[in-house]
Amino acid sequence: MVGVKITWLGHSAFLLEAEKKLLIDPFISGNPLAPCSPEELNPDIITVTHGHRDHLGDTIEIGKRTRCRIITIHEVANYIKSKGVFAEGMGKGGTVNVEGIKLTMTDALHSSSIDASGFSFDGGSPAGFIIQINGHSIYHAGDTGVFGDMKLIGELYEPELVLLPIGDKFTMGIKEATKAVELILPRTVIPMHYSTFDVIKQDPEEFKRAVEAKVDTKVIIMKPGESIDL
């Protein structure tokens, strides 16, 4: 099994590197935790979980420069295309094979409006992604609260690694994220979407203690710019 390098870019942004490079929710400009500039990123694929600016981020600018493939919910894809960049829309429950990487769109409990130029556009429905790459299954939950079908996601796709928000207020907090881990039962979980701004400040060590007191799942607390290998 060939490895996958995973780098946290702060907030909910991750770069997955194998034969191809997959960039998730590239909120770089305006992200105080970002360890790089948008110009340093040259992905083959971008996935966007929903339309909020801290997830859509620099997708359009990076897409224009690199001509990478962009995969997102249908309505966000239409918005990106309106800016002169091609994007591919898909729906929840569907799977696409992109450059040898299988992407399955899952549900998420959140919202997805796109605020730009003083207007709010319909961003459809928020989502998460199951990413099957080089024999590994990874679940990026997007912005979400905990929901019962996370157990079904765990049973169907058996993700060995889960990327979960813990920031509270706009997503689930530590208590709810711990329950999500109990439902999914992955081998490893990485917390995300916390402490980017004061309003979502959380202690990831508290999350680590809560999870490891409940289940046999390893919690890896990453620093922005840090990488791990699967």
Curated annotation (Swiss-Prot):
<dbReference type="InterPro" id="IPR036866">
    <property type="entry name" value="RibonucZ/Hydroxyglut_hydro"/>
</dbReference>
<dbReference type="Pfam" id="PF13483">
    <property type="entry name" value="Lactamase_B_3"/>
</dbReference>
<keyword id="KW-0378">Hydrolase</keyword>
<dbReference type="InterPro" id="IPR001279">
    <property type="entry name" value="Metallo-B-lactamas"/>
</dbReference>
<dbReference type="InterPro" id="IPR022877">
    <property type="entry name" value="UPF0173"/>
</dbReference>
<protein>
    <recommendedName>
        <fullName>UPF0173 metal-dependent hydrolase Mbar_A3716</fullName>
    </recommendedName>
</protein>
<dbReference type="GO" id="GO:0016787">
    <property type="term" value="F:hydrolase activity"/>
</dbReference>
<comment type="similarity">
    <text>Belongs to the UPF0173 family.</text>
</comment>
<dbReference type="InterPro" id="IPR050114">
    <property type="entry name" value="UPF0173_UPF0282_UlaG_hydrolase"/>
</dbReference>
